[in-house]
Swiss-Prot record:
A divalent metal cation binds at D8, H10, H42. Homotrimer. One of its GO terms (biological process) is isopentenyl diphosphate biosynthetic process, methylerythritol 4-phosphate pathway. The lineage of its organism: Bacteria, Pseudomonadati, Thermodesulfobacteriota, Desulfuromonadia, Geobacterales. Keywords: Isoprene biosynthesis, Lyase, Metal-binding. The record marks H34, T133 as: Transition state stabilizer. Belongs to the IspF family. This is 2-C-methyl-D-erythritol 2,4-cyclodiphosphate synthase. Its cofactor is a divalent metal cation. Gene3D superfamilies: 2-C-methyl-D-erythritol 2,4-cyclodiphosphate synthase. It comes from Geotalea daltonii (strain DSM 22248 / JCM 15807 / FRC-32) (Geobacter daltonii). Its EC number is 4.6.1.12. One of its GO terms (molecular function) is metal ion binding. It is an enzyme of class 4 (lyase).
Length: 171
């Protein structure tokens, strides 16, 4: 078993879409970044990369590379999962927290979980996403940005239950 932790933050600005967990969230501002700036998927990607000892997303998808301009972070997460899979790992579980004063995200969390589970080739029951505010404290509380934290537990594929291995083999 291996565990990794990830964190990401992006500034909220006008003229950008707000994408979290691969979901387009209706809001008057979006996150500024080289890619689609999906802080949730970036934090999860960093957690997985940390668990396999492969650095962070900046190493794999540098913001100086035009190939990643406007990149879909679901595709980046799928690439990261491929690196873990190539090393014999599967997702044990992912637990992630989005920190945002606004907008309210509860209604979007189920779809975020589904998107993440699909990208990570696992069951939705292994993915937990939650959202919290900072009670109007700090940059998130002032609505200047959104942050996300994630922890990923990876298991060797042979350590998974026979039922889970069967599900993964059909994907």
């Amino acid at each position: 078993m291996r565990i990794g932790h990830g964190y990401d933050v992006h500034k909220l600005v006008s003229g950008r879409k707000l994408i979290l967990g691969g979901v387009d969230i209706p809001y008057e501002r979006g996150l500024l970044g080289h890619s689609d700036a999906d802080v949730l998927l970036h934090a999860i990607s960093d957690a997985i990369l940390g668990a396999i000892g492969e650095g962070d997303i900046g190493k794999h998808f540098p913001d100086t590379d035009p190939a990643y301009k406007g990149a879909d972070s679901i595709k980046l997460l799928m690439h990261v999962m491929g690196l873990a899979r190539d090393r014999g790992y599967a997702i044990g579980n992912v637990d992630a927290t989005i920190v945002a004063q606004r907008p309210k995200l509860a209604a979007h969390i189920p779809l975020m979980g589904e998107n993440i589970a699909k990208a990570l080739e696992t069951e939705a029951s292994r993915i937990n996403v939650k959202a919290t505010t900072t009670e109007e404290l700090g940059f998130c509380g002032r609505g200047e940005g959104i942050a996300a934290y994630a922890v990923a537990l990876l298991q060797r594929r042979h350590e998974l239950s026979p039922e889970t291995r069967e599900v993964l083999e059909t994907r």
